[in-house]
Structure formats: C-alpha cells, structure tokens
C-alpha cells in the first residue's frame, strides 16, 4: 500500500474516512504520539524545528526592512518624523477604481501605499539607521542569518550532528550558556551598538563600517574604564534643548542616569538605555557563571532544590524531587517558558507606551494604540498556553511516587481550597463590579447622575504619589518636597523622573478616578475567572471526584460515552477552550480602557472618559459607538476614503467571528446528515461527479469542531477590534 498521510501514524493512515486528514493535521506536531518515537528522536525533532522557527523569524524581519527600503519613504520620514506618515509598502492593485488610487496615495508616495503602524520607522531611526542603503544592508544580513538557520536545522538532523539526550538534559550547562550567552553577551553587544552607533547618530555623527574604528564614542576613550573614573562617562549629557539627530544641544556622555524623557522625542534618553543594557549584561554574565558544569565549581540545581525543605514542615518535603520532574518533562519546561514569556509580553505592552524607548513614537498615536493592543493579545494567548502544557504535564509526565509530599503534590492535595478561593474571588468581583455599574446606569436613566456610587481609588493614588506624582496632594515619599528622598532625587539619581511623572504630555502614571476604579475591577474579574478556569483545568487534569480515572482518557476527550453521565466538557482541553473566551473578553476590556483613556488624553478632553466610564451605557455610547463612526463611513453612496479598508476588515471580522458560532453551537449529527445529503447530490450531478474521493466524508469530531469554532471566534474578534482601533485612532489624528 502506498504511503498515505499521515506517515507518522499507521493507524490514522489506514482510516477510511476524512478523519484521517483532520486528525493527521491535529497531531502533526504532537511528536510524542507518533509511531516509533523515542525520547532521543523527540528531543532532536524539537531542537531541529527551533532552527526552522528562527529562519522564519529572520526571513520575516528581513522582509520588513526590504519592503520599506524598496517601497517606503524612510529617508523622507527621517527629515521630519512628526509630519511625514511612514509607508509600510505599496499596494499593487487597489480595487474600486480611481477613488481608491487617490485615497491610498499618501505619505508623499507616487501611488497607493499602506501606512506603517508598527513603529519600525521609529525603532530603526533610534538605533542609528538613516538611509535606504542601511535598510537593505540589514535585510541582506537577516536573509543570510535565515539561510544559516535552515542549514543549522538540516545539519542537526544528520546522524553525526544529532545531539544526545544527555546533552538536552544538562540543565546547568544550558542555563549558563543561555544566561551568559543569550542574555549577557547579546545585552553587551547591544550596549556596544548603542554607544558606538546609535548615540553618535542621535548627535548627528554617522558611524558606519568605514569609520567605526576611528570614531571615539567618548572623548576620553577607554581611559576612565581602566582608571576606575567611571563617572566621567556620565558627565556632560545631552541638554534639554538637544535636537535629536543633530549636534545642536548635544553632550558627550554615553552612560547616564538622567531619568524622564528627551523633551523633543518624548522617549527615554539613549544614554540611559545604554547604561541599562550594560547593567543587565554584567548581571547576566555573572549569573551565567553560577552553575556547576564540568569544572566542579558552582551550584548544582538538584542540590539547591533538594535542600529547599522549610524547617517548619508546613510545605512538606519542599522542592524534593522537582529537579527530575522538571528536567524530564518537556511540557513542564514549556509551561514555565510560556508563563514567563507571557508576563514579559504583557510588560512590553505596558512599558512601550508608558516609558517609550523609540524617538517620536509617543507622538504617533495610532502606532502606540496598535502596539499596546498587539502585545496584550499575544500575551493572553501565550499565558493560556502555559496552563495548557501544565495540564498535559500532569496527564503525561507527572509521577506521584517521585513527588511525594513536595510542593507540587501538595498543590494537587489542596486543589479544592485553591479552586474554591479563586471561585469566591471571581464571584465577589463580578457581582460587586456589575452591581456598581448597573446602579450608576439606573441613576443616569432616572436623570439623577449625582446619585451614582463613585469610588476614588485612593490606594492606587497613594502609590502614584509615593512615586512622585503631586497632583493628588498626598505629600508622601517622593511627592513630599521636604523629604530626603525628594531632595536626593533632584541631584543624585534620575533627576528627570519627577519632571516626567508630573507632566501631562506623556502616559506615565496617568491620573485616575472612579471610572478607572470600576474598569480595574472589571479587568480583575476577567483575570481571576480566566485563571480559575485554567488552574482548575490543570489541577483536575489527572482526575476529580466525579471522574477519578480522567488521566487515562488523555488531554482532550469529549465524554466517556453515553453510559457515564456528566463526563462531557471536563477534559483539560475543555478548560483551555473555555478559558480562551474569558481571556479574549478580559483583554477586550483592557484594550477598550487603554484606548478610550488615551483618546481623551490625546484630544485634550479627559473629562469625557472620567464622566462616561462610570456606567455601562457610557462605554457603549461614548466609546464603542462614537468611535466607530469613522469606521462605518469608510464608504458610502458617494464613494470611499482611506478608511475603507478598515471598514471592510471590520465587516469581515464580524463575519469570521459569527462563523465561529456555527461550529460552536451545532454538533456532529447535524453536519453528518448535511454532508451525506451533499455527497448524494454531488454524485448525481453531471460534471461535478467527475471529481471523486477515496475517503468517506465525515463530520468533525466534537473537540475538532470546538477548536475550529474557537479559532474563528478569536480571529474574527481580533480582526474586528484591530480595524476599529486603527480606523478610529488614525481617523482622528491623521
């Protein structure tokens, strides 16, 4: 018999129905379940696929650089970053005739183009790129790295170059190399780039391959480093009148601790960032020499964990057994990595707008909104994935004997307490927050807005004041002008911080009130409920009182047949599936809040947010409805404008989103009947019946249909909001 897809599963390859195709796609990356898989081959396959992933990333970033260099307006933008709109790439074939051509010919281009809302122009400008030639050079270099990655992936699948399992499980060596090499050396290299290329470029000096060996980044060269006079590198920083990209008002410092923002670019001082990366580099270079490898010095992680037994005995055997549990479970390691990456990605969303690192990006409002929203959604998907792989760990890799009475086993032992506490917190937050919102709605409906319940977030305001925000009048810590910390801050550390935190032109520590208090608790409800579903899914993955043998059914099962009632919807996969809806819901509230607060801030009418955000109708009417007006006017009987593409994306997003419900609400029988009717008609229709199939068409399984429904729901949801966000922001601010 000829080899049929999927080759990795003979059982599936012999399936006579279309299930073969869908199950084949679904399990293609579940290497553990493939025929003839060994632990060694599993690790080697994953390792090789990392090279493929890197190749794709390098190719993609190379494409960004290449298209901007070829079709963009980078060199024009550099001359006037605040007034020229950055072009992402050309539009080859604008449909809908001459009005479309005119609507999309922008940014000084000769033909229709797309505007870039990704912030790459600001990023490239900040790190010292100035010409299209620079961009082409970068694109070629990344293309080379991409090819190198592909060769590396191929090489590591050859017998001679395949790493052994022992190499993959050498945790100390991997940690040392990742800490020192990945974080330490790359941070040091980045400091080098900032000091040698980016900072000179910000002062009007062009450093390239032809002159970088004879341009001193600092007038005194390496002298201060070797004589211990490091503070000389911080003397004479750029002045507050410095014009970015020119020598006017520039200084000579390379490593500073100024704090706050460059007055013209509204971004962090480049010299502060170089200093930051140098500090990070030193920390990680030291951290990467802490663990015991071939040399017999340093820490053994296993010894560290075995020693972690709390003296009071309240955590049982502490971390005993954890080293082998984690080191032998790829899912546990992936769960930890995803949890960390998810948190970092959300922090990136937060810090990219509150502490902008790139010159002039803070004044590009649409880009700010797009980047915040993008990173929060990505973070949501990554974090839910962490719990999914945590659950798979419990089902496939967890060994109760190895973990007796340690912290992991104790999590399982008192899971009822954990789950019920999370449930209580979610219920409390939900009912109280909704109660306040609805009460306020009713008061407005009755024409008595003064009877709203408006709660000032005094604790959060106190924390903001402690960091130096004076407008609340708390007079505490850094906002107390007579305190020693305040006076020291003026001269020793971050003198620019206190100015920045009290300026209204940035997004540092925004002024908050009752509307913020309410939406904060709505978001807290979403976070706690998402966490509840995910934690319950992982802790109940091995079994529950209702279904003690759950782990024998695997990660995703629909039910245990008709004879065992109540076993539907309780697989670990179902928990993940439900949690994603809550995650999307929560990030919806987060991005609505961020966007509305910033729109009113940028337009100078913060009172609109403050007054309308305290009741639900305010959100629906003054945020969603009011800001969709430009969007739904992307085209009308008189033609179209440059927002039309977002109007269509908005409609298309709704369509995809609604299609999701078709898969989520109906089950297999309906589709099976429909499929058989369609197949009957197909076989009896002339011409059509020339096309035959070998596999008998069958409906998707319950779990697959849910996945397809969830995918459409998620993609449609995000498409719809992305179009709304970009159109409403760019429509207002150009």
Swiss-Prot record:
Task: Give me the residues that bind chlorophyll a B1, please.
Answer: 654
Which catalysed reactions does the entry list for this protein? reduced [plastocyanin] + hnu + oxidized [2Fe-2S]-[ferredoxin] = oxidized [plastocyanin] + reduced [2Fe-2S]-[ferredoxin]
**Source species, domain of life:** Eukaryota
**Residues where phylloquinone binds:** 671
* Sequence positions that bind [4Fe-4S] cluster: 559, 568
Task: State the annotated membrane topology for this chain.
Answer: Multi-pass membrane protein
- What GO molecular function annotations does the UniProt record carry, in alphabetical order? 4 iron, 4 sulfur cluster binding; chlorophyll binding; electron transfer activity; magnesium ion binding; oxidoreductase activity
Q: What is its EC number?
A: 1.97.1.12
Compartments where located: Plastid, Chloroplast thylakoid membrane
Binding note for cofactor:
P700 is a chlorophyll a/chlorophyll a' dimer, A0 is one or more chlorophyll a, A1 is one or both phylloquinones and FX is a shared 4Fe-4S iron-sulfur center.
Q: What does this protein do?
A: PsaA and PsaB bind P700, the primary electron donor of photosystem I (PSI), as well as the electron acceptors A0, A1 and FX. PSI is a plastocyanin-ferredoxin oxidoreductase, converting photonic excitation into a charge separation, which transfers an electron from the donor P700 chlorophyll pair to the spectroscopically characterized acceptors A0, A1, FX, FA and FB in turn. Oxidized P700 is reduced on the lumenal side of the thylakoid membrane by plastocyanin.
Which family would the database say this protein is a member of? Belongs to the PsaA/PsaB family.
Task: Name the chain's protein.
Answer: Photosystem I P700 chlorophyll a apoprotein A2
From which organism does this entry originate?
Capsella bursa-pastoris
Q: Which gene encodes it?
A: psaB
